[in-house]
Amino acid sequence: MKLSNQAHLAYCTNVHRGNSWQETFDSLENYVMKVREGVAPEQRFAIGLRLGADAGRELADTRKLYEFRKWLEEKNVYVFTINGFPYGNFHGSPVKEQVYRPDWTTNERMDYTLLLFSILENLLEPGEEGSVSTLPGSFKEFLPGEEIPDILLKKVGACALEIEKLAGPKNLDLHLGMEPEPLGLFETTAETVSFFDKLFDKGTDEEIIRKRIGVNYDCCHLAIEFEDAHEGLDSLVKHGIRLSKLHLSSALSAKPTENNLLRLKDFIEPVYLHQVTLGKDGQCIRRI
């Protein structure tokens, strides 16, 4: 839905299971529509659609895409952005650092991302804006060297040129949002600025790269880095980096009472990454 300042506010579906297109569509009907009824039943409702590679390939089928467009019209909902960070499974079985595979050194990541843009292009009306979010290049431990590999920068730059081609026929404002995240190739605002400086320097067409590649600023990720959001966003704008999208999430605030600590143990699980800071003696300084 649109806010008073005309910005789009969407409900993101990555919180629901959906490896296949059928699973994804079922979550739209069973969960997203219930959220819509509780939040904005009379307004045109926006969906931030998470599509893994399998679901994306299935939805790219001409008939399925047509049926999905009809469903969107009937339900008075729309998709203006796609979460393209998790390529494969994102629920149930351990994900952890595997969520970064394939990374931006591979053709698989670029092909998958462009597939999502192709789907989005079909869902948007002429002249509209749309985005896809993606990982921050790679996982730090996958690329232990100090320098960012040229192949990664070239893949992202090449993706920008392909997005430019996709956007042209319908005059769409399409852009890719790279998402800084703890343990990612770039995780802080300073590292993000450094990455984009290298990206602009290595690219064959800086103007197109600046137009088509930006940052998906996930507030919870940068909060884990103890960053001030106002300062971080101001820095990105100052350096001419496009703000592709903002991710907002909420968390419970609880005092460390015995009962609360017991309840929080439910969050000890093997599926997702948990950021922990240890001292030299091995003692936990902080765990996020």
What are these regions (language model features)?
Residues R63-F68, G130-G137, H239, V271-H274:
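A broadly tuned preference for mixed-charge, low-complexity surface segments
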Residues M1-G127, S131, L161, E207-R212, ...:
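N-terminal pre-domain/capping segments
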Residues I163-R287:
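Acidic/histidine-rich catalytic cores of soluble enzymes
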Residues S20, G56, E141, K255-T257:
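Intrinsically disordered, low-complexity acidic/polar segments
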Residues S93-G214:
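Active-site acidic/histidine proton-transfer and metal-coordination neighborhood
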Residues R57-D61, L143-E147, E227:
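Short, solvent-exposed loop/turn segments at secondary-structure boundaries
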Residues N14-H16, R50-D54, G84-Y87, L135-F139, ...:
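Active-site beta-loop-alpha junctions enriched in small/polar residues
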